[in-house]
Amino acid sequence: MISPTNLLPARKITPVSNGGAATASPSSPSVAARPRRLPSGLQSVTGRGKVSLAAITLDDYLPMRSTEVKNRTSTDDITRLRLITAVKTPYLPDGRFDLEAYDSLINMQIEGGAEGVIVGGTTGEGHLMSWDEHIMLIGHTVNCFGSRIKVIGNTGSNSTREAVHATEQGFAVGMHAALHINPYYGKTSAEGMISHFEAVLPMGPTIIYNVPSRSAQDIPPEVILAISGYTNMAGVKECVGHERVKHYADKGITIWSGNDDECHDSKWKHGATGVISVTSNLVPGLMHSLMYKGENATLNEKLSPLMKWLFCQPNPIALNTALAQLGVARPVFRLPYVPLPLEKRAEFVRIVESIGRENFVGQKEARVLDDDDFVLISRY
C-alpha cells in the first residue's frame, strides 16, 4: 500500500559489492526495495566506482494523498487489456471540444469491443491542448464512461515537473492509468529517463510510451528493465518493432504494439499483449477480432490498406480526415494539422467500400469532402 504521508521519498544511495554500483533504498513501501539496475556504462561516472545521485531529490510533498484514489484500479487490471484505442478529440467550429461527438465516438469504441482509451495522446492531440483542457477531458471521460472502459490519461511531458503535476491531477479526477513518454526535444541520459519515470510511477498504474520517431530518442531496454520491478509499472507501448516486443515479452514485461500494421504479428507471433491503436477509432470491431480471435492473416491483409492510408502523413491527419468523411466528427482541424489532399480523400472512400461500410463507426455514407468543407483553427 502506498504511504499517504510520504508519497515520493528521497532515496538513500548506498554502495554495494556488485562492481561498485549503487542501490536505491526507498523508505516508502510503495516501491519494492530492490537493487537498482543501472544502464551499462553508468557504473563508474564519479571516478569512485559508484554512481552519485546526490543531485537527485524527489519531492516529499505532493498534494494528492488519497489511497482510495490510487487503489481504484490495479496494475493487473491494465495489463490484461488487449485493445486500447488512442481516441481522437473532435472539435467545434470555434475550436472548443465537441463533447457530443466525443461521447458518441467513445460509445462506438465500447460497443466495438475496445477495453481502454488513451485520452489526449498523440492521436487525441494532447500536445495542442492546455493542461486545463487536458485534465477536463480526462475527468469528463471518467465521469461518463469510467465504469465501462479503462481511461488512460496521457499525462506525460518532457518536463518532469509538468508530468508530475498533470499525473497527480489525472489520478485525482479518476483516470485508471497514466501514459508517459520519455523526455523529448531536450532529451536526457538513460539515468535521467529512469529518474523521470521514477518520479511518476508511485502515483498509479503507468504505461511507458516509446516512439523514437516522435521523441527523437529511443528508450533503451536497460531503462525499462530498471523500472520493471515497480508495482505500478503496467508495461510499454512499443513502436520500435517485433524484435523489441519479443525481447520484453520474453522477460515477462507487458507490451502493447504501437504500430497498427505490425500489431497482428506482434500479438500472435512475438508475445505482445495487444495494441494501442489508431485504426480502432474507425473499425473497433475488426481490431477487436484481430486481437482476440487468434491468428488471422486474411483479416490482417484486409485491414492493411486502411492502416497504410492512416499513416500516409503524420498521425492524426488522416484519422481526422476520415472521421470527418464518415460524418462522425466535424471537419474542424486545430492547426498545424490540415486535411489530406483531395485524391487521398477519394482513396479513403474506396477503402471503406472495399472493407465494408458496416464495419466502420457512424451511420452516414463515406463521402469525399471539398476543401471548402474544412475549418482550420489557429486560435483555440
UniProtKB/Swiss-Prot annotation:
It is an enzyme of class 4 (lyase). It is found in: Plastid, Chloroplast. GO terms for biological process: diaminopimelate biosynthetic process; lysine biosynthetic process via diaminopimelate. Gene3D superfamilies: Aldolase class I. Sensitive to lysine inhibition. This inhibition increase in an allosteric manner with increasing concentration of the inhibitor. The active site is at 209 (proton donor/acceptor), 237 (schiff-base intermediate with substrate). Pathway: Amino-acid biosynthesis; L-lysine biosynthesis via DAP pathway; (S)-tetrahydrodipicolinate from L-aspartate: step 3/4. The keyword Chloroplast applies. Keywords: Allosteric enzyme, Amino-acid biosynthesis, Chloroplast, Diaminopimelate biosynthesis, Lyase, Lysine biosynthesis, Plastid, Schiff base, Transit peptide. Pyruvate binds at residues 123, 276. This is 4-hydroxy-tetrahydrodipicolinate synthase, chloroplastic. It comes from Zea mays (Maize).
